[in-house]
Regions:
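Flexible, glycine/charged-enriched surface loops at secondary-structure junctions
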Residues: 53, 79-84, 142-144, 203-207, ...
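A generic local secondary-structure boundary/capping motif
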Residues: 78-81, 120-124, 137-139, 157-165, ...
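Phosphate-interaction motifs
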Residues: 1-148
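Generic structural signal for well-ordered, non-membrane alpha-helical segments
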Residues: 36, 59-67, 122-125, 186, ...
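Short glycine/threonine-rich loop/turn motifs
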Residues: 178, 205-330
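Phosphate-binding glycine-rich loops and their immediate beta-loop-alpha structural context
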Residues: 139-231
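Structural signal for hydrophobic packing residues in well-ordered secondary-structure cores
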Residues: 47, 74-78, 95, 126, ...
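Short, glycine/charged-enriched secondary-structure capping and boundary segments
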Residues: 43, 149, 186-189, 246-249, ...
């Protein structure tokens, strides 16, 4: 592709580089328009003798075709691409879910001059029909070799952006508190947990109370598991203060494994994540919620719960990586 200013009679088939306006300032033709005979005649009637155009050369790929081709290899399951309009394709979520972005592939494609992809943050919660990403081709055309380079990156990565749908899960809540504090803890903690879970398409199906004793915690976990719950959330009078505190000990007695304790996220530093193995790739997650779970202000639980409810097995490394952006200012 090269840029030129051509006499109007030589402009047919080339791409208009700038908007054309009439004497009153009204737009006659938009930039990016491939000029036809009729449009050239119209411009001649306005007294226009020459126009600035982009001239495509053999091997060039028009901006809209380039955007379509890139979208075809960028999309992972869970997203739908629009038609290309003005060199842009938007990707929308097919269902409520969690955004998945291959950051390395995204960086590699965006390094190619003239190609851009902007996405929501990896692991962000997304709602159905909301925009997840946008593809924009900068010039009016790209050399075929650059488009093919981007296609190879997307193909080898298995796509760049997708949405893992939220699954309707049964959630059990274990409240660890003395009998004297149960009413207060229930009032402070349970509504916030129930509303969080409901907003993500799942339901709190069982609530059990135990005293702060590791054996009672283990029995409560076993009972909630037997009730058919898919995910457990524990909360209590205080946050879990150590890997060997009462709740972690109870989780181990119940057969669980502590994945990680302590998160580089504020609010939510005193988070615990554990799993009970159940024969599935994810296992049964157990969130040991910190005290901030009582508030509906965004905290560590809001970062992890959607991912767990979409079936992801969140790891120690995943939690550690939350430190970049982990200061959640209220």
């Amino acid at each position: 592709m090269f840029l030129a200013t051509l006499p109007i009679d030589q402009a047919v088939g080339h791409i208009l580089r700038h908007n054309i306006v009439d004497a009153a300032g009204h737009k006659v033709l938009p930039k990016g328009k491939r000029l036809t005979d009729d449009e050239v005649t119209r411009l001649r009637g306005l007294g226009i003798a020459a126009v600035r155009v982009a001239v495509l050369e053999p091997g060039d790929v028009h901006e809209d075709e380039a955007a379509r081709r890139l979208a075809a290899v960028v999309c992972r399951p869970g997203v739908t691409a629009t038609e290309a309009v003005h060199s842009r394709v938007n990707l929308f979520a097919e269902a409520d879910g969690v955004v998945e972005v291959d950051g390395a592939a995204l960086l590699a494609i965006n390094t190619i001059d003239g190609l851009t992809i902007a996405t929501l943050p990896n692991h962000a919660l997304i709602r159905r029909r909301k925009r997840v990403a946008t593809i924009k081709i900068i010039p009016f055309a790209l050399p075929k070799a650059l488009v093919q380079q981007a296609e190879r990156i997307g193909f080898e990565a298995g796509g760049v952006v997708g949405v893992r749908p939220l699954l309707p899960r049964r959630v059990g809540v274990l409240l660890v508190a003395s009998p004297e504090a149960r009413e207060r803890i229930t009032r402070l903690v349970l509504p916030a947990i129930e509303s969080r879970v409901a907003e993500l398409g799942s339901m709190v199906c069982a609530v059990r109370y135990v005293k702060p004793d590791e054996h009672e915690v283990a029995e409560g976990i076993a009972a909630l598991r037997a009730d058919g719950n898919d995910l457990l959330i524990t909360a209590g009078e205080t946050s879990i203060m150590d890997r060997d505190d009462v709740t972690p000990q109870g989780i181990r007695l119940a057969g669980g494994r502590i994945e990680h304790y302590g998160a580089p996220v504020e609010p939510g530093n005193l988070l615990l994540l554990a799993y009970l193995e159940d024969g599935t790739p994810q296992g049964m997650p157990i969130i040991g919620a910190p005290g901030c779970v009582r508030s509906r202000a965004t905290n560590i639980v809001d970062l992890l719960l959607p991912r767990l409810l979409s079936g992801e097995r969140v790891t120690r490394r995943d939690i550690i990586e939350l430190g970049h952006g982990g200061l959640l200012e209220r």
